[in-house]
Amino acid sequence: MANIEKKNNSELQEKLITVNRVSKTVKGGRIFSFTALTVVGNGEGRVGFGYGKAREVPAAIQKAMEKARRNMVTIPLVNKTLQHSLKGSHTGSNIFMKPASDGTGIIAGGAMRAVLEVAGIHNVLAKTYGSTNPINVVRATMNGLTNMKSPEMIAAKRNKLIEDILG
């Protein structure tokens, strides 16, 4: 698993999660191409992922980075951790994440760790169940993070005060 990190001029953190060689069988033999899975984030709650395919590795990575920048979403964080425990799933991958106290760090494995790092989440406990395919894990993580709601969002939806929501 390749894990390359880079910061560009607009302060976006870019991480390459995986590069994979795939083949298409035709009458004359095999045609090889490459796929790349990347995540991009600003370290303050904005994160996106991209999946690019091309005949050459650099082109696949570039396509994936562009898609990741286009598909960024904002995640409501509190004290560099999650608002509440959450679950996410995509096909065979299921993930569970819960907020952790200051100084815990990111306790997560593989592709999920890269997503959490570029999103700016510093304290979290996370576990992957089922398939550990990086593409499915990243999609499950993004599904979970986008479904996270802040107390302000819940209060606005219910037409109540934030104090009523927090108890």
UniProtKB/Swiss-Prot annotation:
The UniProt keywords, alphabetically, are: Ribonucleoprotein, Ribosomal protein, RNA-binding, rRNA-binding
A family per Pfam: Ribosomal_S5
- The UniProt record lists the keyword RNA-binding: yes
Q: Name one GO biological process term.
A: translation
- For the keyword Signal, the answer is no
Q: Output the InterPro entries linked to this UniProt entry.
A: Ribosomal_Su5_D2-typ_SF (IPR020568), Ribosomal_uS5 (IPR000851), Ribosomal_uS5_bac-type (IPR005712), Ribosomal_uS5_C (IPR005324), Ribosomal_uS5_N (IPR013810), Ribosomal_uS5_N_CS (IPR018192), Ribsml_uS5_D2-typ_fold_subgr (IPR014721)
Domain of life where this protein originates: Bacteria
Q: Which PROSITE patterns match?
A: RIBOSOMAL_S5, S5_DSRBD
| SUPFAM superfamilies on file | dsRNA-binding domain-like, Ribosomal protein S5 domain 2-like
Q: Kindly list the GO CC terms recorded for this protein.
A: small ribosomal subunit
Q: Which Gene3D superfamilies match?
A: 3.30.160.20, 3.30.230.10
Q: Name one GO molecular function term.
A: structural constituent of ribosome
Q: Which residues form the S5 DRBM domain?
A: 12-75
What PANTHER family is this protein classified in? MITOCHONDRIAL RIBOSOMAL PROTEIN S5
The record's annotation in NCBIfam families points to:
rpsE_bact
Summarize subunit and interaction data from the UniProt record for this chain.
Answer: Part of the 30S ribosomal subunit. Contacts proteins S4 and S8.
Q: Which HAMAP family match?
A: Ribosomal_uS5_B
Q: Which family does it belong to?
A: Belongs to the universal ribosomal protein uS5 family.
**What's the record's remark on domains?**
The N-terminal domain interacts with the head of the 30S subunit; the C-terminal domain interacts with the body and contacts protein S4. The interaction surface between S4 and S5 is involved in control of translational fidelity.
Q: What does this protein do?
A: With S4 and S12 plays an important role in translational accuracy. Located at the back of the 30S subunit body where it stabilizes the conformation of the head with respect to the body.
Annotated protein name in UniProt? Small ribosomal subunit protein uS5
**Source organism lineage?**
Bacteria, Pseudomonadati, Pseudomonadota, Gammaproteobacteria, Enterobacterales
> Which gene codes for it?
rpsE
